[in-house]
């Protein structure tokens, strides 16, 4: 099917998101199978899943990068992004959600809402992404559809409404009652679930289904209060409401984020996946439903609103970079307005650099098809972009628009890295540069005192997998040091500095004079450097050099050399010499000035605090809490169900190395835990002194 056959209202850009092991990739595999994209079902546990195409993913059985693919169903074109569920790969989820119009949240019928489900849900709230939910693994021991829905309401604050009533559960799960059509679907094993029989509702479920349907209709009546005819029917004659009417109101409720309908099934056992595909098309929004995209016009500084139209000016967002051994650098983009043609020259407005598109590719996991153009609503990949990275805006050369960026969280863990042989030094530098372009949460820096190269990321698994990729994709063997905490420094009060950099050594000298004011910025806002120079006391051609010097000075703090964060710097005054001043002199002076100001601004060291969730048998609860307290943990809450307790706490990362091993020995291997970065906080004075001594 060519794209020309699809209007914007028939496009669905969706993500599949969940906690690790909820069965997200298996669900996507079934979608590909039923929509005719694959002829054999790939199994994750056999390492044959189409979407998990990186070698490490097939070995580890987890999804690391967001694979993109396109399928066709009920006359609609569905672009699907399968996102990772492990906390170390949060940026993959974040950048997918930024470019999606809707999402399917997959939950495990036994566990319900798990810690990573909460993280992903919060990220989707941030971007206002409409969601439907699929309670998967209904065939597992202990599966509880209504329990999972209850946990969605309690933990996520979701307006979770069942649209199915399961028939049987665990090994007896055979199908479900569709509360909208009031039909019972029994799946036929011999057709791999591709066919089912429709029957009447079993007698023992009739009363429960009637109650659930009434609750569903009453909830829908509150979605659109202007639809008085629907409300009247719900109150006076609910049996007269047609399926069509229900779907219309449901779609409105989902798109406005007022309702999260919940389906059930077992992707592994091929039950319920086509029903999920049906409602993706019926209820999730098209690019038109998501409305205009907002950006900033760089020439005027004003906010602009772009209609999703293929005839409008080009506005696209780069949301992922990938390096391919055969094709080179691939940039994934989402087009919000206009059309992008192969061979066209465009502007990266974020960087103010011109780019040229050499090829356009439609992706199916790691297979690709060449395309001549992409138009509004498409998600695709381009080859030939040299400067564009995650979060950059691409637009027409005469239409300078910048879209909202993708925020990357600060890394929390550092490791020293060096090539195994001196000859690999150049290759290692290239590999690190390529990987940090692909992944904004992976940073590379140099320790100024030791000269060591330091890599920083979101967790041990994150850095471990990147090291694997260096060996496999870039053929670089590297030694890595022990993981260390990625501390930061910041300031706690306002201060200023006046710095002169003067050098006379025969011939032309060096002269620069810079006055700065610095103050603490809001936590999480990052560093800001602004020039308040008036009257040309520092000529405007030297201002960028001062700013660059200040930024470089902030890269290493004054207490223990850790990068400074959340500092606002204003360049307020200075002077220059007609002959001796130069860009280099002002850059050096800017760096010296910011260091001097920081020393006077009561600097402190910050450490990453992790949100830790432990699920333990109740008889070990006291030991687990005692152990978290000893690790400087702050217990946030605990809850119990079925002899198991869940404890959530905030604990400094520096206290969490080797935690899994000690948790296993505390609980005889019966407890599990997850942790994710929460925020940075000031370290206690005594620990700060120890860090500075090191």
From Swiss-Prot:
Q: Which UniProt keywords apply?
A: Cytoplasm, Elongation factor, GTP-binding, Nucleotide-binding, Protein biosynthesis
Q: Which residues form the tr-type G domain?
A: 9-288
Q: Where in the cell is it found?
A: Cytoplasm
A GO molecular function annotation here is: GTPase activity
Decide whether keyword Repeat is in the record.
no
Please, one GO biological process term?
ribosome disassembly
Annotated GTP binding lies at: 18-25, 82-86, 136-139
An example of a Gene Ontology cellular component annotation for this protein is: cytoplasm
Report any Pfam family annotated for this entry. Answer: GTP_EFTU
What does the record give as the function of this protein? Answer: Catalyzes the GTP-dependent ribosomal translocation step during translation elongation. During this step, the ribosome changes from the pre-translocational (PRE) to the post-translocational (POST) state as the newly formed A-site-bound peptidyl-tRNA and P-site-bound deacylated tRNA move to the P and E sites, respectively. Catalyzes the coordinated movement of the two tRNA molecules, the mRNA and conformational changes in the ribosome.
Similarity remark: Belongs to the TRAFAC class translation factor GTPase superfamily. Classic translation factor GTPase family. EF-G/EF-2 subfamily.
Q: What is this protein called?
A: Elongation factor G
Instruction: Identify the gene encoding this protein.
Output: fusA
């Amino acid at each position: 099917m060519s794209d020309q056959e699809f209007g914007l209202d028939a496009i669905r850009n969706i993500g599949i998101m969940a906690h690790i092991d909820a069965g997200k990739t298996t669900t996507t595999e079934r979608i590909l199978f039923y929509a005719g994209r694959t002829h054999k079902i790939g199994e994750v546990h056999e390492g044959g899943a189409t979407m998990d195409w990186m070698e490490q993913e097939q070995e580890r059985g987890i999804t690391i990068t967001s694979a993109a693919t396109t399928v066709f169903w009920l006359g609609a074109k569905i672009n699907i992004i399968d996102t990772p569920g492990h906390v170390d790969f949060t940026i993959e989820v974040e950048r997918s959600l930024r470019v999606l119009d809707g999402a399917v949240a997959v939950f495990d019928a036994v566990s319900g809402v798990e810690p990573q489900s909460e993280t992903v849900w919060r990220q989707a709230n941030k971007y206002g992404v409409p969601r439907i939910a699929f309670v998967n693994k209904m065939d597992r021991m202990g599966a509880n559809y209504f329990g999972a829905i209850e946990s969605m309401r309690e933990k996520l604050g979701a307006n979770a409404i069942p649209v199915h009533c399961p028939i049987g559960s665990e090994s007896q799960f055979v199908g479900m009652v569709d509360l909208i059509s009031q039909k019972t679907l029994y799946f036929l094993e011999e057709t791999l679930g591709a066919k089912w029989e429709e029957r009447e509702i079993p007698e023992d479920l009739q009363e429960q289904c009637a109650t659930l349907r009434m609750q569903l209709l009453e909830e829908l009546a509150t979605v659109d209060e202007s639809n008085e005819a629907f409300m009247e029917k719900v109150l006076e004659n609910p049996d007269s409401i047609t399926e069509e009417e229900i779907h219309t109101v449901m779609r409105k409720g989902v798109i406005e984020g007022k309702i999260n309908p919940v389906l059930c099934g077992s992707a592994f056992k091929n039950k319920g996946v086509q029903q999920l595909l049906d409602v993706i098309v019926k209820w999730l929004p098209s690019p038109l439903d998501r409305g205009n995209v907002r950006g900033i016009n760089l020439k005027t500084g004003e906010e602009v609103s772009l209609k999703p139209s293929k005839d409008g000016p080009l506005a696209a967002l780069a949301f992922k970079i990938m390096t391919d051994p055969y094709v080179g650098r691939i940039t994934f983009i989402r087009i919000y307005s206009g059309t992008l043609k192969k061979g066209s020259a465009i502007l990266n407005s974020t960087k103010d650099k011109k780019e040229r598109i050499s090829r356009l590719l439609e992706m199916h996991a790691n297979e690709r098809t060449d395309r001549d153009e992409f138009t509004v609503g498409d998600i695709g990949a381009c080859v030939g972009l040299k400067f564009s990275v995650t979060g950059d805006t691409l637009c027409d050369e005469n239409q300078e628009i910048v879209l909202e960026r993708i925020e990357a969280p600060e890394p929390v863990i550092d490791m020293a890295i060096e090539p195994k042989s001196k000859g690999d030094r150049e290759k290692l530098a290239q590999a690190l540069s390529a990987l940090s372009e692909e992944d904004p949460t992976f940073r590379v820096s140099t320790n100024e005192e030791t000269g060591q190269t330091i890599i920083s990321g979101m967790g041990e698994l994150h850095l471990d997998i990147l090291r694997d990729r260096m060996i496999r994709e870039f053929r670089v063997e590297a030694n890595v040091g022990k993981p260390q905490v990625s501390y930061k420094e910041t300031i706690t009060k306002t201060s200023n500095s006046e710095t002169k950099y003067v050098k006379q050594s025969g011939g032309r000298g060096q002269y620069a004079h810079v006055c700065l004011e610095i103050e603490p910025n809001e936590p999480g806002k990052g560093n800001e450097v602004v020039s308040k120079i008036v009257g040309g006391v520092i000529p405007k051609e030297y201002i960028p050099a001062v700013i660059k010097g200040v930024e470089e000075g902030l890269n290493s703090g004054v207490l223990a050399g850790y990068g400074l964060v959340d500092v606002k710097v204003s360049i307020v005054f200075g002077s220059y010499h007609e002959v001796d001043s130069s860009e280099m002199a002002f850059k050096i002076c800017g760096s010296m000035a910011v260091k001097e100001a920081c020393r006077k601004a009561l600097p402190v060291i910050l450490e990453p605090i992790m949100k830790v969730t432990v699920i333990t048998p109740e008889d070990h609860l006291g030991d687990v809490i005692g152990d978290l307290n000893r690790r400087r943990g702050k217990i946030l809450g605990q809850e119990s169900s079925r002899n198991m307790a869940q404890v959530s706490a905030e604990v400094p990362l520096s206290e969490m190395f080797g935690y899994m091993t000690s948790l296993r020995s505390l609980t005889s291997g019966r407890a599990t835990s997850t942790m994710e970065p929460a925020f940075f906080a000031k370290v206690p004075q005594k620990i700060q002194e120890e860090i500075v001594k090191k």
